[in-house]
């Protein structure tokens, strides 16, 4: 299913090329996670605030997209599509969003210093659930 989705990203008539990458709308259910767990808050913003996942999910459920103009980065591995943005993907899935903006990226486009989970993923780590589900950790770590 992921490989078919990826070719749809590549070949879609409504896809938009962004540099070497392709921007497209997809159902978040077709994208897998790259980790077993995620923090219950997003990373610190420029004002020092760590937004809770539940706030983003609540906004999405009311039709407000707090991630406007920030497509989910996806890449292919073993015929499946995986996300480099697990917390945002989780938020969309939990809110029941049917279509999200994704951008297909290559491994070379990912900043491994900021995305250690992606580096580990490419070193043959694979989520226990094969990327189908993810656990939300409680606490501020």
Predicted feature descriptions by range:
Residues 1-81, 86-141:
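Compositionally biased, low-complexity segments of secreted and virulence-associated proteins
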């Amino acid at each position: 299913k992921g490989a078919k989705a990826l070719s749809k990203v590549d070949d879609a008539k409504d896809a938009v090329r962004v540099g070497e990458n392709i921007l497209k709308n997809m159902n978040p259910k077709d994208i897998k996670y790259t980790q077993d767990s995620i923090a219950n808050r997003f990373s610190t913003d420029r004002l020092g605030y760590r937004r809770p996942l539940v706030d983003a999910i609540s906004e999405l459920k009311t039709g407000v997209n707090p991630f406007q103009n920030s497509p989910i980065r996806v890449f292919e591995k073993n015929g499946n599509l995986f996300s480099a943005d697990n917390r945002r993907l989780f938020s969309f899935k939990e809110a029941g969003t049917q279509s999200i903006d994704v951008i297909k990226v290559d491994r070379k486009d990912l900043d491994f210093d900021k995305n250690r989970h992606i580096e580990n993923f490419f070193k043959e780590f694979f989520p226990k659930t094969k990327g189908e589900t993810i656990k939300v950790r409680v606490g501020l770590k």
